């Protein structure tokens, strides 16, 4: 029986890239996996066929040979045969993780670096919460922070072993850091119980770090907070996290910003909002009010006569700067008419006199319109009752 074309087996074009090959293989491998098709010989044959096709096309050298000579390029036994080689075992472990959860206790992390858990290991990322004022968010600032961090032990240079000694390869996992157990068609990897995933054994640990290869130190860092930052913004400082293990790269430090509530301004993006009280006289006759600005200055706003509560005034360019831009938001001032309290006898007399003078409809257009609509409503009810 002649072999099918590998591209046809996976259902991809000859120009398919690595991602497309991997996606097609995952789909077919899961569809024909013997655990999903118990006793189905045809599914088992197709499963092996899919594996063989992927083993060839996912390898650049094998793919080049196949594209040139076809199946004849592997007449001496084929690309790894129909069984499960080491690479396929790794890939099936990846599929198992994707569909059924992580079967590797402790999490082996991303593959690479020769596949040895005892090799270089990246340090953990750190988080620091920084609260600043709205004024500081307006101007930007440089903040000095202190944080405890795991850094490489200077005594053992991160090896974890006492000076004059060095770690030895773990005999249980051979330095791999994981042990593999075959279960049916799956090769499940677990953290090595002997070395706890390090891939090495330290017989004589460093006294300074206790064999960890790292010690905790308090570091001082300067954080540049740019103007225009908003609540919830995250600043990443690459390489300022915890030191890596066994020469691995350091993690990153993430600064999470929060803005303190302001007693006068509310913020919406780059725009600022505030509410300012005005007197009845200013609202009726006009006047000027002085309003603070976020930059620390003050500005004067002209209030025209007849201004009503919730009237809004816009001051262009008096808001917050837009992050990493030359644009600036606006300041919106909303006024509300404050009713006087604790009046003197004379003040009461003047207000009563003002009320007794009578009011024309155009003096209170909103009130006149409101009461006119109320009268029409009740007149309509009376008319319908008589009918």
From Swiss-Prot:
Keywords: Chaperone, Cytoplasm, DNA replication, Metal-binding, Repeat, Stress response, Zinc, Zinc-finger. GO terms for molecular function: ATP binding; heat shock protein binding; unfolded protein binding; zinc ion binding. CXXCXGXG motif repeats lie at residues 153-160, 170-177, 192-199, 206-213. It is found in: Cytoplasm. Binds 2 Zn(2+) ions per monomer. Pfam families: DnaJ, DnaJ_C, DnaJ_CXXCXGXG. The keyword Chaperone applies. One of its GO terms (cellular component) is cytoplasm. A zinc finger (CR-type) spans 140-218. GO terms for biological process: chaperone cofactor-dependent protein refolding; DNA replication; protein refolding; response to heat. It comes from the Bacteria. InterPro entries: DnaJ, DnaJ_C, DnaJ_domain, DnaJ_domain_CS, HSP40/DnaJ_pept-bd, HSP_DnaJ_Cys-rich_dom, HSP_DnaJ_Cys-rich_dom_sf, J_dom_sf. Zn(2+) 2 binds at residues 170, 173, 192, 195. Participates actively in the response to hyperosmotic and heat shock by preventing the aggregation of stress-denatured proteins and by disaggregating proteins, also in an autonomous, DnaK-independent fashion. Unfolded proteins bind initially to DnaJ; upon interaction with the DnaJ-bound protein, DnaK hydrolyzes its bound ATP, resulting in the formation of a stable complex. GrpE releases ADP from DnaK; ATP binding to DnaK triggers the release of the substrate protein, thus completing the reaction cycle. Homodimer. This is Chaperone protein DnaJ. The gene is dnaJ.
């Amino acid at each position: 029986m002649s072999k099918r074309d590998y591209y046809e087996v996976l259902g991809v074009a000859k120009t398919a890239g690595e991602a497309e090959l991997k996606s097609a293989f995952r789909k077919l491998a899961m569809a024909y996996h013997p655990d999903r098709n118990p006793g189905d010989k045809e599914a088992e044959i197709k499963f092996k066929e899919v594996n063989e096709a992927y083993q060839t096309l996912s390898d650049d050298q094998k793919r080049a040979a196949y594209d040139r000579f076809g199946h004849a390029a592997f007449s001496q036994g084929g690309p790894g045969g129909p069984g499960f080689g080491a690479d396929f075992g790794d890939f099936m472990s990846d599929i198992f993780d994707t569909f059924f959860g992580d079967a590797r206790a402790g999490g082996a992390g991303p593959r690479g670096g020769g596949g040895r858990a005892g090799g270089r290991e990246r340090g953990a990322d750190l988080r620091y919460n920084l609260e600043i004022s709205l004024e500081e968010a307006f101007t930007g600032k440089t903040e000095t922070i202190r944080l405890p961090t795991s850094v490489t032990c200077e005594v053992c240079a991160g090896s974890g072993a006492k000076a004059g000694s060095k770690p030895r390869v773990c005999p249980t996992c051979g330095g791999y850091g994981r042990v593999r157990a075959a279960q049916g068609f799956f090769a499940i990897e677990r953290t090595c119980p002997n070395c706890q995933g390090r891939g090495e054994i330290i017989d004589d640990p460093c006294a300074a770090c206790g064999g960890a290869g790292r010690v905790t130190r308090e570091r001082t860092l300067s954080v540049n907070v740019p103007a225009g930052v908003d609540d919830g913004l995250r600043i990443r400082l690459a390489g300022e996290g915890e030191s890596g293990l066994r020469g691995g790269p350091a993690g990153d430090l993430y600064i999470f910003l929060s803005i303190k509530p302001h007693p006068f301004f509310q913020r919406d993006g780059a725009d600022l909002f505030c509410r300012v009280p005005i007197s009845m006289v200013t609202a009726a006759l006009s006047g000027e009010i002085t309003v603070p600005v976020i930059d620390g200055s003050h500005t004067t706003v002209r209030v025209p006569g007849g201004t009503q509560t919730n009237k809004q005034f816009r001051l262009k360019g008096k808001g917050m700067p837009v992050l990493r831009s030359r644009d600036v938001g606006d300041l919106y001032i909303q006024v509300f008419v404050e009713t006087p309290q604790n009046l003197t006898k004379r003040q009461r007399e003047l207000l009563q006199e003002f009320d007794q003078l009578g009011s024309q409809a155009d003096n209170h257009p909103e009130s006149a319109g409101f009461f006119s609509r109320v009268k029409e409503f009740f007149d309509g009810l009376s008319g319908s009752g008589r009918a």
